[in-house]
Amino acid sequence: MTEGDRELSALIQELWDNDTNRLRPGIDYRISLQGKAGDLAGVPDDSDGAGMPLFSFVDENIFKKETFLAFISLLDNYESDTGEPEIVTPEEEMENHRFLDSVIKTPTMKIAHKYLVEKRLSPEDTTGFKQQLYKIWFELYARKGSSKPDSSGFEHVFVGETRGGHTVIGFHNWIQLYLQEKLGHIDYKGYSVNANSPQPDENKHMLALQFSWKNGIKPKGSIFIGVSPEFEFSLYTLCFLMSPNERVKVSFNLYDVEIVCHHYNQKHIGTTYPVPVKYLNV
């Protein structure tokens, strides 16, 4: 781990410690891991390691909190198919700003903002910082194979997209996963694990998994579970602005994690997600 990685790890630990809206596994939510998913090489597989949903319980009272409410209001604002141009209505733009307003007020984003200002990576004034966040996350761009703006960092990471009608791309958020599973649109296929990754644990806040959505398959994805929208938004913004690398190794709480962050034209987030490396014994 480099000195920069250690510094970032300490900062992410501070974000974690101040994530007051994080849910507690086994208390505020419960998941059912069931079996291991089939090994896919990017193609659908009939084998299903899970006959039941991933989420067996979530205390939805948390969704009444400001950042959760604002986040959830954004999830129905997008066309999932890449190649379908996105049209942002004035109401949707207002919802984007409402979400940013709610996140900027949280302890986690205040910590991230202060650090980014110290590193001269973000403007100090709130208005300028909001504009920076909007550009990184919500400005539309054309994904590979499309000639018109059909994607954004927020849509890809937090909402999910489909490519060619049979492949799910992005979709790295537990709230969207839970809500779509509740509607019957998600079929959880089981957890993913290989020789280099830790065995999954229902009491940990991270999971690699396989699922289908809207007739498409996500052969392998990884997500945080139970964390607040502001924690993920702050974490990924930090990694995007700080790290010239596309994979940054961090250690916080009980986890060694790689945060993958691909830029799009150096201006927007292409994708970003956690990869569990090791669970630390404390």
Swiss-Prot record:
The lineage of its organism: Eukaryota, Metazoa, Chordata, Craniata, Vertebrata. The active site is at 156, 172, 218. Its EC number is 4.6.1.-. Endoribonuclease that cleaves single-stranded RNAs at 5' of uridylates and releases a product with a 2',3'-cyclic phosphate at the 3'-end. The UU and GU sites are more efficiently cleaved than CU and AU sites. This is Uridylate-specific endoribonuclease B. Belongs to the ENDOU family. It holds the Pfam family XendoU. It catalyses: ribonucleotidyl-uridine-RNA = a 5'-end dephospho-uridine-RNA + a 3'-end 2',3'-cyclophospho-ribonucleotide-RNA. PROSITE patterns: ENDOU. Keywords: Endonuclease, Hydrolase, Lyase, Manganese, Metal-binding, Nuclease, RNA-binding. Monomer. The keyword tRNA-binding does not apply. Residues 4-278 form the EndoU domain.
